Amino acid sequence: MEKNHNPNTWSELPLDLLNLVFKRLSLVNFQRAKSVCSTRYSVSRQCVPERQIALLILFPKEDNTDNSTCKLFNPDEKDKLYKMQDLGVEFAKSVCRATYGSWLLMQDSKYHLYILNIFTRKRINLPPVESQLGMVKIERTIYDWFHFSHGHYSFSLSSPVFWIDEESKDYIVMWGLGVYCVVYAKKGDTSWNQIPQTSYFYDMVYKDHKLYFLSSTGTFQILDFSEEMDNKTSKVVCLLDRKLVVTVTGKALKVAKMWRPTYRTWSFRVFKISSSGYEKLDSLGDEALLLDLGITVLASDVEGFKRNSIYFSCRPSGGYETNASDLFLFNLETQKMELLHKFDCSSLQLYRSRWFLPSLTHT
């Protein structure tokens, strides 16, 4: 008896079955499966894999002929690197300054800023950095230098952070304007808005529509952007070699990173920030800390992640790196540093690398 093969039946699987399959796919297979047909793309928008995935993005060298590509590393698949293509001719000449979900905040050599979705290639251009609303005025001069209203200074775009809604594409981008203040721009803005009383910027994290701000003079603020600005300010003690981190539940932490030359290893101390000062924490519990992103995640929700650990990469800092092409985790329970992965790439490539947590619902 002759069998009737219909080549189109594979795209007509029940939606409930497709939904179950999509929830069990890895990141790369998820992206591949949703591009098969319109039906599968529609299903992909309604579900995400059961576990969050953390990826490290490796940028191409500037002189690479294939400079519109990048590579993705998944710690759960240590022997694989996935290649992303057609990211634009400016991609290799731009630097990633921050990540949120599947989006990258990119800066080119002339300080032009834009947001790029690594999977959909959607690009959003941001206002010129010299377009400022506030007391500090900036003028772009010849050769793309900048002149400040208080005189000539080297331009500093410090520790930018951002948030974007995957569906509406509403966004807010913030960065430190040298020692002067923090500035921000939302969707529809044509200029950067300067935030008063945010001078001597040191570090900041944006989470749940709140900006956690730490100054070099010891001032800690929480600025609420969900409504009109409701500034909450408390004084804290400042230490060197620190990083501001916000936990899953919204608690503010200060993470101190220390180099031990005798053992040629890094060590960390974690402190909870409160109105009375710092409280040392001996454990992150079931959470893992991504130092580059300034956040914690539930380790059980991220493939390949270990609880109570700090994930970090070596970056040039006074020549103290063990190997600038290595990726590490620090276990707070054992107080030991573990080599997570050794990359076959240049120190500059790893220095430019960034962790990101892709959002798979609307990409």
Swiss-Prot record:
Coiled coil: none annotated. Residues 7-56 form the F-box domain. This is Probable F-box protein At4g22165. It comes from Arabidopsis thaliana (Mouse-ear cress). The lineage of its organism: Eukaryota, Viridiplantae, Streptophyta, Embryophyta, Tracheophyta.
